Regions:
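Transmembrane-helix signature of polytopic, membrane-embedded enzymes
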Residues: 13-15, 94-116, 135
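Membrane-interface alpha helices of multi-pass inner-membrane proteins
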Residues: 49, 111, 143, 155-170, ...
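Transmembrane-helix motifs of polytopic, lipid-linked glycan transferases
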Residues: 81-102, 116, 139, 143
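Specific aromatic-rich, kink-prone transmembrane helix
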Residues: 93, 113, 133-149, 155-163, ...
Length: 638
């Protein structure tokens, strides 16, 4: 049975499937290009520097892209070839599912055409780990179709291998695993749970995740903290109506009748009762992803099944109304042609088609995102997935200009630091064109890469990092430029570029605690209290003057936690320790001043806010507090 599944047969159906899949690749290669998307540059950077010792991200997506980059070189076209190839494989599995549902050549072609212009279209021109993940989902769903049709139960081993690869691609495959597990209980095939093969497949799937899980365990489960922070920082949680709308518009509103018909067949039609599992699976996925705050596109591959069912139904409808001797070809041709024509107006919302100035005018009547949001980041004139393709080369050029100026005036080797992984990825991609060193960043994969390389320098050109953070690390922070672009994401626009010199601490040791404060210091603080933690800090500094136990932001956040709990004295002690550790950061004086005000120590609060404004004359909050304190002290001079 396994041999039968994998054996290549050059039948007319196979040629049709290959033709539609190839057309999908060609479509994305002939489309115009706006430039690299933020996510794509991140995968390029990880692929270029890939190491199994840095599994901040599951390895399949960067390794898959690395294969294309090694064979064909670095370019946007190559990245989109990798993406569209994944889309082509999803289409292949969708067409095979239509065939297993009883579809003949017309249904197979319809399924392919429907999927080319479905919600998958955006992923053909935007590479991310969703692309290979969708292939895994689609392959697993095809295997389950075969199982439901009575194939050998040993196919669960194949499903397990696919899901194991999925675990090393993107952990959202767990949604599919849960949906499969629950949906099987709702059909007669629940008896499969009495047999060993399904459990063997599940075991193989979880074994596949072991390398990633073990790496995360060794690094303090960094992914969990990062995912939580990222979700709270950017991910948009949709109300139920928005979530349902997101299943319609991004998936092509013209496709709605097709997949709804497919869903109805799978759920309610007696002739389709053998495949009822997929109707339940869709409902479980919808409910689970919505309740857990997942993105609407996580379940995109399940639509290949619904579309295949809808296409087979259309074929059967025509068959019942046609004369075998005089088949009605014109109506059959009109269906895919009408679908493509109805799909074209929505295409500019999802893939690069129009010149950018025309695109801005085109999307304006319906709203920039047409009611579809995946992130809570501010947007301007373009949807987020379009705006994130603009400005990166110009940003790298601006940083390179400051870098060249700094090299001509500095005796030190100058490095480049970026505030987030998007900026760092762009600087990596364009470093060769502008003759820059490899950037570092405390965000995502770049954090661990910098820890491993330990190639820290004395001076840095920085972009995307706040002045207060830079001042806590460097004695001199000079603003040298500002990056602007008319079409980039607003949170990347008007981004200051600094030249930082006079390193005040050991950057390698600072980097090691930049994600999580020193564990020994944290344990003392939690178990023995603030006073003992302050003593511990001084003891460590006496033993090692270069020791760094926390960042200014970490201790600041902790101090505010104590302040919110009305533990004012302890918060003051923590803020004072922060002032001692980072005396040239204006922010630490602001925080200490606020705690002293809460403790009615107004004169000392005035001293700290005064120092804060001296360090940063643009500190509006500090100036406001100074005015308040002057009034308070005038009324209560004692």
């Amino acid at each position: 049975m396994l041999k039968r599944l994998t054996r290549l047969r050059l039948t007319p159906e196979a040629l049709l499937i290959a033709g539609v899949a190839f057309a999908n690749v060609v479509l994305h290669l002939v489309l115009p290009e706006y430039g690299y998307h933020r996510d794509e540059m991140y995968y390029v950077a990880i692929a270029d520097g890939f190491s199994f010792s840095n599994l901040d991200m599951p390895p399949v997506a960067p390794l898959y892209l690395k294969l294309f980059l090694m064979l064909l070189g670095h370019s946007v076209r190559v990245v989109h070839l990798a993406a569209s190839a994944c889309g082509a494989l999803v289409i292949v599995f969708g067409c095979l599912i239509a065939k297993e549902f009883g579809g003949k050549r017309y249904a197979i072609v319809l399924t392919g055409v429907f999927l080319v212009f479905s919600g998958l279209v955006i992923f053909g021109s935007l590479y991310s780990y969703d692309d290979p993940s969708f292939v895994v989902w689609s392959g697993a769903l095809y295997v389950i179709v075969r199982l439901l049709k009575g194939s050998d139960q040993r196919l669960w081993v194949v499903a397990g291998i696919l899901l194991g690869i999925g675990m090393l691609t993107k952990l959202t495959v767990l949604f599919l695993g849960l949906a499969v597990f629950l949906s099987l209980w709702l059909i007669s095939e629940r008896t499969w749970y009495r047999r060993p093969w399904i459990w063997l497949g599940a075991g193989i799937a979880f074994i596949g995740a072991l390398p990633y899980v073990l790496w995360q365990r060794a690094h303090g489960w960094y992914f969990l903290s990062y995912a939580t922070t990222y979700a709270g920082r950017t991910t948009h949680e949709s109300p139920v109506l928005d979530f349902l709308w997101n299943q319609v518009l991004p998936n092509n509103i013209a496709l709605l009748p097709v997949w709804l018909a497919g869903l109805a067949l799978l759920l309610f039609n007696r002739e389709w009762s053998r495949f009822r599992f997929f109707g339940y699976c869709y409902l479980v996925l919808c409910g689970t992803i919505f309740c857990l705050g997942g993105q609407f596109y996580f379940m995109m591959p399940i639509y290949a099944v619904l579309v295949a069912a809808g296409a087979v139904w259309i074929e059967q409808w025509f068959a019942m109304r046609s004369n075998p001797e005089r088949p009605r070809l014109v109506p059959r041709i009109c269906v895919p042609v009408a679908y493509v024509l109805m799909s074209l107006p929505a295409l500019p919302f999802f893939v690069p088609v129009l010149p950018v100035d025309l695109l801005v005018r085109y999307v304006k009547p319906l709203g920039v995102n047409a009611g579809v949001k995946t992130e809570d980041r501010q947007i301007a004139e373009l949807p987020q997935h379009m705006a994130d393709r603009f400005g990166w080369e110009e940003m790298a050029r601006s940083v390179a200009e400051v870098y060249r100026q700094s090299q001509s005036t500095s005796h030190d080797t100058v490095g480049i630091v970026a505030g987030n992984w998007g900026e760092a990825s762009a600087l990596h991609v364009y470093r060769g064109a502008f003759d820059m060193p490899e950037p570092i960043s405390g965000d995502g994969w770049f954090y661990f890469d910098a820890l491993q390389r330990q190639a820290f320098r004395e001076s840095y050109v920085a972009i995307g990092v706040s002045r207060s953070v830079l001042q806590s690390v460097f004695r001199h922070v000079d603003r040298k430029g500002v990056f602007t672009h008319p079409h980039c994401m607003p949170d990347e626009n008007n981004n200051a570029i600094y030249y930082c010199t006079g390193l005040k601490l050991n950057l390698g040791k600072y980097w090691a605690v930049s994600k999580r404060m020193d564990s020994a210091f944290e344990n003392v603080l939690r178990r023995e209290g603030v006073d003992r933690a302050v003593e511990f800090y001084h003891e460590r500094r006496q033993q090692d003057p270069d020791a760094v136990l926390f960042t200014e932001r970490q201790l600041n956040a902790l101090g505010y936690d104590y302040l919110k709990q009305s533990r004012t004295g302890e918060s003051i002690a923590l803020f004072r320790l922060n002032v001692e550790a980072y005396p040239e950061s204006f922010n630490v004086y602001d925080s200490l001043g606020e705690a002293l005000m809460a403790d009615r120590q107004y004169a000392r609060a005035l001293e700290n806010y005064t120092r804060s404004v001296e360090l940063n004359p643009e500190n509006k909050n500090g100036r406001k507090k100074l005015e308040e304190l002057k009034v308070i002290l005038a009324m209560h001079p004692g």
